[in-house]
Structure formats: structure tokens, C-alpha cells
Amino acid sequence: LTIEALNALPHCFRIETEGSFIGMIQQIRVEGSNVHIGRFLINPSLTGKGLGTSAMQLFIAMLFENKRVHSISLNVFDDNPSAKGLYTKLGFKVVATVEGERKKYKMMKSNSAIN
């Protein structure tokens, strides 16, 4: 995936630090009052520095500013425990497990101001 291809994706938000592109978050669909995040990528050389946590916190806050958004969902593969740990730390809870070639979890976070 090139930066040009990322820029062409709908509802794709660039993550930058000090003017440098370091990752992206993409909202892929809205179902009723739920927004589903489809992609969340951080440059692997920059993980473990809190940048992904900060970016996701800002993105969550931005989504919940819209009073019609009551929840946010995403999927995470079982073989990505660091991502699952990040989402859990940010208040996402596993709501479904999908078995398959690669086991994954559907996780959801509710807007605490509403619920």
C-alpha cells in the first residue's frame, strides 16, 4: 500500500508526527449508530512509543463528538495480541469470536456519555 493509494481511500485519516506520515486509520462503514474501523496501521519501527494509542484516542474522541455515533467496532486477529491489548486498554470489549483460517475477534466500544 503506497501513500498515494492510502490518500485515495475513502474516510482514511493520516497519522503524522512532526510532519512525517507514520500511519493511518480508516473508517470503513457506518451501520446505524455504529462506526466500524477497518484499518489501523502504524509504521512498525515506531510502535511501542504511545503514538498508536494517542492516535486512536483522538480518533475515538472525534467519532464520539458526533452525537449519532453510539459505538465503534473493529476486528482484530488472534495472532496480533499487541493490537488486541491496545484496543482493550482503550475500552473495547470482545463481542464475538470468528473462527476460520485466522481466528479473529470483533471488538466494540460504547460511548460512555450515552450508555
Residue ranges of model-derived segments:
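Acetyl-CoA-dependent GNAT
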Residues: 1-45, 62, 66, 111
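Conserved acetyl-CoA-binding loop-helix of GNAT-fold acetyltransferases
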Residues: 42, 48-62, 85-89
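Conserved GNAT acetyl-CoA-binding A-motif
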Residues: 65-75
